[in-house]
A protein has these predicted regions:
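Residue(s) in the substrate-gating loop at a strand-loop-helix junction
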Residues: 134
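Active-site helix of classical SDR
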Residues: 113, 150-153
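Conserved NAD(P)H cofactor-binding loop of Rossmann-fold oxidoreductase domains
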Residues: 81-86
Length: 265
């Protein structure tokens, strides 16, 4: 098999990253799929046992030993997809809960991006870096503020990094992926876990069930139920010599966010 690209993906256990990885594997690319835990690694290895062009690693972005993989593996495309969503009202959860969202979604994302950049720069290759953020970065979603604001920070940093890479004429590109609501299970976890992080003594705790019901109704209405279109779109962009900087999808949610910013913000 002639290998086209070597791609490393964090947070690739399931959902959009996993489905996109399958598309990339079909196109004769070599893909490193990275999981959060050892258990996830073994399960994913079993699922991909017949794929000779796939390799599975545990890469917890909060584990310094795991991060060394980014320095030693050979890849020319890097996709930073790992993230968390701890819910609860900003004034009703601990600073540690807010900090954890930022630690993973902002600081650890930047940490892995920097390592991937250095890996590619030292090899003097035309590398590509993709970063997953969220359309929710532009929305004040009740009891999800720690998550949405961390994604806003990540998106802002990506805009800046893109300008800085262009300033120095780098042969490494950066693409920001701002995803809308897809039915991967992530949104449901984020909606349901607010009870774990809200302080019972907080007034906001009393409204958690009401907020959860509204959010479940909202996501049931707007979530895209299939991942075929988004995985195809992302795999195509990763295969391009010059991928575009900004990918916002799906279209209808992208337009709704634009309308919100213009008329309601």
């Amino acid at each position: 098999m002639v290998i086209n690209m070597k791609i490393l993906i964090t947070g690739a256990t399931s959902g959009i990253a996993y489905e996109t990885a399958l598309k990339l594997l079909e196109q004769n690319n070599f893909v490193y799929l990275c999981t959060h835990t050892e258990e996830e690694k073994y399960l994913l290895k079993e699922k991909l046992a017949n794929k000779s062009n796939a390799k599975v690693y545990k890469l917890d972005v909060c584990n310094e030993n795991d991060l060394k993989l980014l320095d030693i593996l050979d890849y020319d495309v890097f996709w930073s997809h790992a993230g968390i969503g701890n819910g609860g009202a900003v004034l009703g959860i601990s600073l540690d809960t807010i900090r954890k969202n930022y630690e993973v979604n902002v600081f650890k994302n930047i940490a892995v991006i920097k390592r991937a950049y250095e890996n590619m720069r030292h090899k003097n290759i035309e590398g590509k870096i993709f970063v997953t953020s969220s359309l929710a970065a532009y929305l004040p979603l009740t009891y999800l503020g720690a998550y949405t604001s961390s994604k806003a920070a990540l998106s802002s940093l990506c805009y800046t990094m893109n300008k800085e890479l262009k300033l120095i004429g780098s042969n490494i590109s950066l693409t920001l992926i701002e995803l809308g609501a897809y039915h991967t299970g992530f949104n449901q976890v984020m909606i349901d876990n607010k009870e774990r992080f809200l302080k019972p003594a907080s007034t906001f705790y009393l409204y958690k069930d009401k907020v959860t019901k509204k959010q479940n109704n909202l996501f049931n209405l707007i979530e895209k139920k299939t991942l075929a279109a988004v995985s195809t779109k992302l795999s195509k962009q990763m295969s391009k010599k010059n991928p575009k900087f900004l990918i916002r999808t799906p279209l209808i949610q992208r337009l709704l966010v634009k309308l919100y910013i213009i008329f309601l913000r």
